[in-house]
Amino acid sequence: MQAEGVWSLQPLADMSATEFRVWQALLEDRTGIVVSAERQSFLQTSLGGRMRELGVGDYASYYRRVTDGPHGAMEWSSLLDRLTVQETRFFRHRPSFDLLATYLRERLAEIGTAHPLKLWSVGCSSGEEPYSLAMVAAETQVEMGLSWYFGVTGTDISLSALNKAREAIYSPRKLDEVDAALAQRYFQPCGDGRYQVVASLAERVCCARLNVLELARAPMSGMDVIFCQNLLIYFRRWRRREILNRLAERLAPGGLLVIGVGEMVDWHHPALEPVADERVLAFTRKG
């Protein structure tokens, strides 16, 4: 045990160019995420940290481990938590949420309250975006003096991120982006300095694991709102188009798709119309 502990503190050898390409290909094949040569040090550090925990001394041995059947699948899931970016915040890119509020008011005026509203946060990370969507929907109810059912689905590939989203507990720093009135209405102190989303809002949000490469098999359909912000930047351009085409198919007629500004500038879909607002990159489905 002592020898292993001493070994775990020793630095791993740098990745060779061949090893980097092998890991780069595995990550892209399984998740679609592209790790550029400029981010080799990030990949090496992420792998190295996990390898030290396991006492694995070289990249080839660890590669065999994560590709070894069911046991490899479990280890791959643990590794993904290190490799996927989980930094996000509430109401990230405010203009998108301003658009959402306007859209929901118009949507309700058009279809009425009998139709349940379905919202989807793709790449929801630790939950800040789906809870932001839920807050906007809840506030729209209050503003319009109406009551209707709405539900928010958050999906992500990282199990640890989803666990955080389901826990719905956040540090005070996370709430800096939330208006004081909303923070008071939708969060309650935990007693340890952190804050938890109130049950009445949390019960509107459901989080599930989903690899965006498997959107063709996703059960979501007839969505009124889909947010896919700050996710597409990690994929090749052809893959971005493929993902967006799949998401467009999941929209209800009149539904809203919001993506990150600058993430896809040359994409068009025959069933969608761009939203005329230069602050956002969004589309509505015809019909």
Residue ranges of predicted features:
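Conserved beta-strand signature within the Rossmann-like core of class I S-adenosyl-L-methionine
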Residues: 254-261
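Conserved SAM-binding loop of SAM-dependent methyltransferases across substrates and taxa
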Residues: 126-144
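Conserved AdoMet
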Residues: 2-120, 244
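Core SAM-dependent methyltransferase catalytic element
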Residues: 266-287
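A short glycine-rich, Lys/Arg-flanked "PGG" loop and its adjoining helix->strand segment in the class I
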Residues: 241-253
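Extended basic-aromatic, gly/pro-enriched interface segments that bind polyanionic ligands
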Residues: 122, 143-227, 231-239, 265-266
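Conserved class I S-adenosyl-L-methionine
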Residues: 115-127, 153
